[in-house]
């Protein structure tokens, strides 16, 4: 990928630039906990975005998206947001840096990525983080890593129209090879936990169902509202920190639906803590067991799964896979699977054939390795 970028950069701009990269991410466990003030447990992966960048001595940004074969340029003082969706991310990062008092100038760039689109692995965060990190380095802006992540988040909010949380950008900026990060979404404190499945006889693989169910209404908002209603009854700002005993005590004051939603979230908080403790002991069996619990909690209590993802999790269990669950918001997308190496090939074959027989197409197999986040490449 780097070679292809360099060739195109030379063709377009007759010069050479510097290379920067960032990563997509997985979230091992901790789903729908972020907006409840809880914990998430992401890691950067070996699929991401690479950009070659060189200052051009003007006030204009000239950008080429190699994967799409599209070109865009915009002035750094222009108010008009570019029409191309991908260019909005670069424009937004530039604008958010300027809002924070960062002085930047025009540059040329060619970029490409290998984060599978639509798989819930945060290709957009990888793009934002690559450019935020690169501009911070190239212009010696001195912006700390947390603010780089917030620049990515603000770009989504203000220029793309996606009201995302901070997890994706955080993982993309702070990612560290061989480690997952437990992020406290209330305090924004985080801790690295060693995660080296390959050294313990395991692989991590995503199975993309390639299904995205169109939804009537606002299912994410509905679930968030459920959580907020229960938190209010409990006299808390967030569900974070609530116990099952407290929930049972107010069961007759809330709807059955709100009860089930809250039961999932409170359980998920504990599962994140359980997984962190288990990893400290090298206990991958407990990690896997909690992943299955999360899947069926998301399916039965939170009701954000779908038939295809339940099918993949069921096949995983039948094949002896250590852990499997929905990854992401739900209603389609991927399962994330923790598989013993000796079972890997048989599981992949079974999942592909069984899924194709039932749904008419194979899931896309995406093996991942936990890797570094935003960085400059040699």
Q: Could you tell me what each predicted segment is?
A:
Residues 1-25, 50-83, 179-323, 338-378:
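C-terminal nucleotide
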């Amino acid at each position: 990928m780097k070679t292809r970028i360099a060739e195109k950069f030379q063709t377009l701009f007759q010069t050479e630039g510097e290379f920067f990269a960032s990563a997509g991410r997985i979230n091992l466990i901790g789903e729908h906990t972020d907006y409840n003030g809880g914990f998430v447990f992401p890691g950067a992966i070996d699929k991401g975005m690479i950009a070659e960048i060189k200052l051009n001595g003007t006030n204009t940004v000239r950008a080429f998206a190699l994967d799409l074969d599209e070109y865009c340029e915009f002035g750094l003082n222009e108010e008009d947001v570019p029409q191309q969706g991908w260019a909005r991310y670069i424009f937004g990062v530039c604008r958010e840096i300027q809002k924070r008092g960062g002085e930047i100038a025009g540059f040329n760039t060619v970029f490409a990525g290998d984060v599978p689109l639509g798989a819930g692995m945060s290709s957009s965060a990888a793009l934002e983080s690559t450019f935020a990190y690169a501009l911070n380095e190239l212009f010696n802006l001195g912006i700390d890593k947390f603010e780089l992540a917030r620049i990515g988040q603000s770009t989504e909010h203000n220029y793309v129209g996606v009201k995302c949380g901070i997890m994706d950008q955080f993982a993309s900026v702070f990612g560290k090879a061989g480690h997952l990060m437990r992020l406290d979404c209330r305090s924004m404190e985080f801790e690295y936990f060693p995660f080296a499945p390959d050294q313990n006889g395991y692989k991590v693989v995503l199975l993309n169902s390639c299904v995205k169910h169109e939804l009537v209404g606002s299912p994410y908002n509905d679930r968030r509202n459920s959580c907020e209603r229960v938190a209010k009854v409990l006299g808390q700002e967030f569900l974070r920190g609530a116990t099952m005993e407290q929930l049972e005590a107010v069961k007759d004051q809330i709807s059955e639906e709100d009860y089930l939603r809250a039961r999932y979230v409170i359980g998920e908080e504990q599962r994140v803590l359980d997984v962190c403790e288990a990893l400290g002991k090298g206990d991958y069996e407990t990690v896997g067991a909690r992943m299955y619990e999360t899947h069926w909690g998301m399916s039965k209590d939170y009701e954000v799964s779908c038939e295809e993802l339940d099918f993949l999790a069921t096949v995983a269990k039948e094949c002896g896979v250590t852990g499997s669950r929905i990854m992401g918001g739900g209603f389609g997308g991927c399962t994330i699977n923790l598989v013993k190496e000796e079972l890997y090939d048989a599981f992949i074959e079974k999942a592909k054939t069984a899924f194709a027989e039932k749904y008419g197409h194979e899931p896309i197999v995406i093996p991942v390795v936990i890797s570094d986040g935003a960085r400059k490449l040699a």
